[in-house]
């Protein structure tokens, strides 16, 4: 993975990016930050490198790092609007399912849990024009079932929805969902 970006530190010649856990950055004489970085929490060079690397490994355009997989998943669902329809798998990471039931549904998301490994069931769960997101895990936790990502993407896109794939278990070493038609990948 160190070679995926093909970057070499111009000062140290290191192939592995340096870690910048917390720092402030030098201001220009006029008080501005020409580097675009003022403090490492919102703009961290280590995060930038990691995000670029993950995007390259996944075959994606952009990447955002979060403090946890749950934070990343929550960001995907919270990008939707109350009233939007979501199709999620019956068998999925328990903590995320509980968050959907306890928080997302009361907030106003319309969530149908379906056996989306069965593509006919997935197609039947879609509400063309109203379904905004299909969320799938493959392999799915905890039974390691596999869903055909390309077919699920075709079904989602045919109904005007986006496909998000939780690929935590497979990682881009084994599966690259974006190359199979997914719109978002979460780890």
Language-model features: locations:
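Conserved N-terminal alpha-helix of the aminotransferase class I/II PLP-enzyme fold
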Residues: 24-71, 79, 95-104
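Glycine-rich beta-alpha junction loops
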Residues: 6, 21-27, 169-171
